[in-house]
Amino acid sequence: MILKSILTHLKAVKWGAWSLVCLCLSLVSGILVALHYAPAAPYYSTTAIDLLVPFGQYFRSLHFYSSQLFLLLTIVHLLIAFPGTDSYTSTQWGRLVVALPIMLLLLFTGYVLRSDSTGSSAGFIAESILMTIPLVGAALNNMLFSITEHGMQRVYVTHIITLDLIWLALAWEHLRRYRIRFSDYLPLAGVACLFSVFIAAPLDPEHLGVTYISGPWFFLGLQELLRYLPPSIAGFIFPAIFILALFFMQKRYPFFIQILLLLAIWLFFYLILTLMALYR
């Protein structure tokens, strides 16, 4: 009874609307940060935003934390609303599935643009992984990253334009179902804004003698797997299995139970890898 009551209360929460509010906060604060960011001197400009631009550190923190909240609330929204996704056509569901890795790439490129020890390492690892993908790897790297040749210029455009437009195109049909009044979600917005006042967004300078650098929290499992498997398997094939399985996560397919089991095993394995990376 207690579990059923908890589930009922969770379903009553408008997780989708909450995530949309966080998306709005992320977009507004991101525009303000982007105005002062210089791809030619990424780490210097990030530091200058924190130290020299009036309220710069606050808006960078708000952009960072509202983006993280957007991802987390979207995941919760997906889990809670999943039983209702059977009404979606394969095309509608497929677009939302593709929107998920695009969302992760948006957050990931945000980490890379900091160009601190975490961002620089993450960027070069991503570039190396893409270059191992047969046929299309070099083209994808040239379109999304190309850090070795162009520094942060390509990543900057990818983060503020390319991925945003792709994600909006994929999710627009779903987003327009929601009509939110920002005034109804002032407590959530207030928490995000207040949290950003007291907790600054991370910025990790280079430290001599440090041999292990943790990447973004949502990619820690992949980072750990790269220690044991080739980049093409750990960085491309392994996550591709999860995305492909999601495509068939609708009850209309006869192998729904098998896909559900595969996803559960994948997530459990990824959780173990993430914990290993956290305690390394």
Report residues per predicted region:
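Membrane-embedded alpha-helical bundles that constitute the cytochrome b-like, heme-associated redox core
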Residues: 1-280
